[in-house]
Amino acid sequence: MAVKRSSKLTQTAMLKQILKRCSSLAKNQCYDEDGLPVDVPKGHFPVYVGEKRSRYIVPISFLTHPKFKSLLQQAEEEFGFNHDMGLTIPCEEVVFRSLTSMIG
């Protein structure tokens, strides 16, 4: 049990770090004291996908999945994590939805 809790804490810390690097997810959104959007349930985080930058809320458990990690690496290579666009995933929405349904 302690290992799972430690893993979840690590995932949460990683997510907070990524979101802070992205700095601004939306100009008119409300944030909590940690700088996280209030409309995102605990244990989840927002990502923006596709040309239209559609917003998806995904569980932090995805951070440990190899295919999602690959998407994050692509995002870092293409956009970096220090920009004002939020965490942007560089793939088509249909591909992202297919991947997330496979993972979840």
Swiss-Prot record:
**Localisation per UniProt entry:** Cell membrane
Does the keyword field hold Transit peptide? Answer: no
Q: Name one GO biological process term.
A: response to auxin
The way it spans or sits in the membrane comes to:
Peripheral membrane protein
Record's signal peptide: none
The record's principal subcellular location, in a coarse class, is: membrane
What does the entry state regarding organ or tissue expression?
Answer: Expressed in flowers and etiolated hypocotyls.
This entry's comment on induction and repression of expression is:
Induced by auxin. Triggered by brassinosteroids.
**Cell membrane as UniProt keyword:** yes
Which key words tag this protein in UniProt? Cell membrane, Developmental protein, Growth regulation, Membrane
Domain of life (superkingdom): Eukaryota
CC terms in the record's Gene Ontology section: plasma membrane
Q: Which InterPro entries match?
A: SAUR_fam (IPR003676)
Q: Provide the function of this protein.
A: Provide a mechanistic link between auxin and plasma membrane H(+)-ATPases (PM H(+)-ATPases, e.g. AHA1 and AHA2), and triggers PM H(+)-ATPases activity by promoting phosphorylation of their C-terminal autoinhibitory domain as a result of PP2C-D subfamily of type 2C phosphatases inhibition, thus leading to the acidification of the apoplast and the facilitation of solutes and water uptake to drive cell expansion. Triggers plant growth probably by promoting cell elongation. Regulates branch angles and bending.
Its family?
Answer: Belongs to the ARG7 family.
Q: What is this protein called?
A: Protein SMALL AUXIN UP-REGULATED RNA 12
